[in-house]
């Protein structure tokens, strides 16, 4: 049976992005600090293991509009995502939005589909497109909260980074206890990576 996964870097005070996200600062103020563990080479052995989990191939992805780009309201211009002409997904990506948009097909097998009918519809479409190869909930925080509320996540990996952001996008606000069971813990000087099974 295919599994639904989610992998998020998080501050010690529970934020997955800093405040004031923008085109210039996609992760908000200081948000980049949450990702140094997999951006700064050479990687510690534990961080390399966690990055392998982050980049493992999946059959399809679900993400929020905020994850896809900084534009709010009706679509403007020809924005195609943060990742250039060949995004790292190599699979269909279903983007939650309140505004219609034609699919965007890019190199390497990534096509962004825009879904205005809510999380459950987007997840159902992603599951069908994945063809048994599993779905990943790619973020951001609001989309992960919806996925947890819907009970579809089987495995959640959290990369705890020893910083305090103070404000921004909290991951677990308003989320009922998902009954997380740790199954693997690895750590480096930059982060502690915990892989959880999610209860039902």
Give the positions of each predicted feature:
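Enzymes that bind and transform nitrogen-containing heteroaromatic metabolites
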Residues: 1-200
């Amino acid at each position: 049976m295919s599994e639904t996964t989610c992998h998020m870097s998080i501050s010690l005070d529970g934020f997955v992005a800093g405040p004031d996200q923008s085109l210039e600062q996609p992760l908000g103020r200081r948000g980049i600090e949450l990702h140094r563990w997999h951006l700064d080479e050479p990687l510690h052995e534990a961080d390399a293991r966690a990055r392998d989990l982050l980049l493992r191939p999946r059959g399809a992805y679900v993400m929020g509009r905020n994850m896809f780009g900084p534009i709010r309201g009706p679509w403007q211009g020809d924005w195609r995502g943060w990742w250039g002409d060949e995004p790292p997904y190599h699979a269909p990506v279903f983007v939650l939005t309140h505004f219609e948009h034609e699919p965007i097909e890019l190199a390497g097998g990534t096509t962004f589909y825009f879904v205005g009918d809510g999380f459950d519809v987007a997840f159902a479409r992603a599951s069908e497109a994945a063809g048994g190869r599993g779905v990943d909930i790619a973020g951001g925080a609001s989309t992960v909260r919806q996925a947890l509320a819907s009970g579809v996540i089987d495995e959640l990996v959290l990369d705890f980074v020893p910083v305090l952001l103070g404000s921004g996008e909290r991951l677990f606000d308003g989320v009922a206890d998902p009954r997380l069971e740790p199954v693997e813990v690895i750590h480096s000087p930059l982060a502690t990576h915990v892989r959880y099974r999610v209860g039902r």
